[in-house]
C-alpha cells in the first residue's frame, strides 16, 4: 500500500520539478536564453552586448528595405515611392554609424577603418545600393507611375 502511494507522489514531485526548471530558465527568473536582450544587458553588466544587438539589427533593416521597394514596385503607388525616396535621401545625408561599430568589433574587415571608400577592399555596398534605388525611383521612364494611375485599375 505504501509503495502504491509513493509512486504517484514521486511522479508528481518529478513533474513539478521539471515545470519549475522550465519556468525558471525560460521565463526570466535567471535571465535564461529566452530572456529579452534588455534584461541581459541591464543585469549582465556587460556593455559589449549592446554592440552585438545593434549589429544583428542591420541586416534585417536591409532586407526590410528591399521588401518595401518590391512591394512599392508591384503596388505602383506614387505616394509610397515619394516617402521611400525621402527616407533614402535622409539616410544618405547622415554619417555612417557602422564605422563606430566596426572599430569595436573584433571581426571587422580589413580596411574598414579607412574613410576613403575607393581605396577600401570592402566598400560599403549597401549604401551604394540605396543610392541606386533612390535614383531609380526618381527617374522618369516606362515604369514611372502617374498619381492617378492607381485609381484607374
UniProtKB/Swiss-Prot annotation:
Q: Does the keyword Signal apply?
A: yes
For the biological process aspect of GO, one term held by this record is: cellular response to ethanol
Query: In the record, which positions carry Pyrrolidone carboxylic acid?
Result: 21
Q: Name one GO cellular component term.
A: extracellular space
Molecular function per GO: corazonin receptor binding; neuropeptide hormone activity
Signal peptide (UniProt feature, chain positions) = 1-20
Please list the residues that carry the modification Asparagine amide.
Answer: 31
Q: Give the propeptide segment as residue ranges.
A: 64-153
- Per its UniProt record, what Pfam families does this chain match? Corazonin
What keywords tag this UniProt record? Amidation, Cleavage on pair of basic residues, Neuropeptide, Pyrrolidone carboxylic acid, Secreted, Signal
InterPro entries named in the record: Procorazonin
Report, as the record phrases it, the tissue specificity of this protein: Expression is restricted to 24 neurons in the larval CNS (8 in the brain and 16 in the ventral nerve cord) and 12-16 neurons in the pars lateralis of the adult brain.
Q: Which family does it belong to?
A: Belongs to the corazonin family.
Q: What does this protein do?
A: Cardioactive peptide. Corazonin is probably involved in the physiological regulation of the heart beat. Clock (Clk) and cycle (cyc) proteins negatively regulate Crz transcription in a cell-specific manner.
In Swiss-Prot or TrEMBL terms, this protein is called Pro-corazonin
Species of the source: Drosophila virilis
Amino acid at each position: 500500500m505504501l509503495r502504491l502511494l509513493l509512486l504517484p507522489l514521486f511522479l508528481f514531485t518529478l513533474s513539478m520539478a521539471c515545470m519549475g526548471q522550465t519556468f525558471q530558465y525560460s521565463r526570466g527568473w535567471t535571465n535564461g536564453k529566452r530572456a529579452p536582450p534588455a534584461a541581459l544587458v541591464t543585469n549582465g553588466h556587460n556593455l559589449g552586448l549592446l554592440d552585438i544587438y545593434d549589429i544583428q539589427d542591420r541586416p534585417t533593416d536591409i532586407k526590410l528595405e528591399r521588401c518595401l521597394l518590391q512591394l512599392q514596385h508591384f503596388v505602383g503607388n506614387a505616394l509610397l515611392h515619394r516617402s521611400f525616396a525621402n527616407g533614402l535621401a535622409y539616410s544618405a545625408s547622415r554619417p555612417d554609424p557602422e564605422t563606430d561599430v566596426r572599430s569595436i568589433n573584433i571581426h571587422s574587415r580589413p580596411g574598414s577603418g579607412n574613410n576613403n571608400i575607393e581605396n577600401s577592399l570592402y566598400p560599403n555596398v549597401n549604401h551604394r545600393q540605396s543610392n541606386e534605388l533612390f535614383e531609380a525611383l526618381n527617374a522618369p521612364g516606362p515604369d514611372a507611375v502617374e498619381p492617378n494611375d492607381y485609381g484607374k485599375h
